[in-house]
Amino acid sequence: MSHKGFRVQSINDALWLNDGHLHDLVNQGHVLGLHSTTHPTVIDNLSREQQREEYERNLDYLKSILGGNAEVKAMSHPCGRYNADTLSVLRGLGIEIGFRSNMSHVEGRSLLELPREDHANIVRKIGI
């Protein structure tokens, strides 16, 4: 690809948020939350310690950008996947509200398991 003049960094710059974008979002009143560090698609298959590391590194990164006193209280489960260890880890990190990626009913759900519809589900439902 490089021999054709394609720079991977140029596509990264166009696709992904940078630290400045995150500051802009916060300054506009948006709430930033955790989503993991490496976005494991089956985070619920990781050990409790691996899950804690995923979310703790994500939290540390956000605080390093936003300032150490920044409150990060929200999160969204990667691919809607989680288990009891995940919920315990998140509570231990001070996370108060979490979102799943579908609207299915979860009996006895907590504030860390709120339903929301993922855009991929919506696109699939309307046939785009």
Segments (PLM) and residue ranges:
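Short glycine/proline-rich turn/loop motifs
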Residues: 2-5, 35-41
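C-terminal active-site subregion of NodB/CE4 polysaccharide deacetylases
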Residues: 37, 44-128
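Active-site beta->alpha N-cap acidic-glycine motif
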Residues: 1-28, 64, 71
